From Swiss-Prot:
Class in the EC hierarchy, top level: transferase
Assembly and binders: Homodimer.
Keyword entries, A-Z: Cytoplasm, Methyltransferase, rRNA processing, S-adenosyl-L-methionine, Transferase
Name of the protein described by the UniProt record: Ribosomal RNA large subunit methyltransferase H
Taxonomic source organism: Clostridium botulinum (strain Eklund 17B / Type B)
Coiled coil regions in record: none
Lineage per the UniProt record: Bacteria, Bacillati, Bacillota, Clostridia, Eubacteriales
Main localization (coarse): cytoplasm
Length: 159
């Protein structure tokens, strides 16, 4: 299985980079992982709603240009479906069974995802009603994908 994570914004914190490197290494047993970092657009403090929409659209275009036609796109969005770790494991398994072996998880920037990206999405996933920094969320997503593969393979994992 091929898994791509498209994330808007540059990872700055060393401890997060170390965590991502660790989960990337762990995941290499189960899938081919590709992480794409896209440059985020600067959002002025006094940005209007219109300005924010323009910024989301610019970031959205970068995301859409990075998505290949054969990818099954899973957006991470507050309006998405919540799943347990076990349900995510089954979901990833079912994607493979249905021939969707190129999964693409999309993490938007600080303003979220554009309508165009949400329309391109095959599935929308929500981790929580809470808001997380998108840099930290990348680690959380990798951990859950790793956990999903462990569950799927009947291997021990922390409950």
């Amino acid at each position: 299985m091929n898994i791509t994570i498209i994330s808007v914004g540059k990872l700055k914190e060393k401890y997060l980079k170390h965590a991502i490197d660790e989960y990337s290494k762990r995941l290499s047993r189960y899938c081919k992982l590709n992480i794409l970092e896209l440059q985020d657009e600067q959002t002025p403090d006094n940005a209007s709603e219109k300005d924010e929409l323009i910024i989301k659209d610019k970031e959205g275009n970068k995301i859409l240009n990075s998505i290949k036609d054969n990818m099954y796109v899973i957006t991470l969005d507050l309006k998405g479906k919540m799943m347990s770790s076990e349900e995510l494991s089954k979901f990833i398994d079912n994607c493979g069974v249905r021939g969707n072996s190129n999964l693409c998880f999309v993490i938007g920037g600080s303003l979220g995802l554009s309508e165009a990206v949400l329309k391109r999405s095959n599935h929308s996933l929500c981790f929580s009603k809470m808001t997380f920094p998108h840099q930290l969320f990348r680690v959380m997503l990798l951990e859950q994908i790793y956990r999903a593969f462990r569950i799927s393979n009947g291997e021990p994992y922390h409950k």
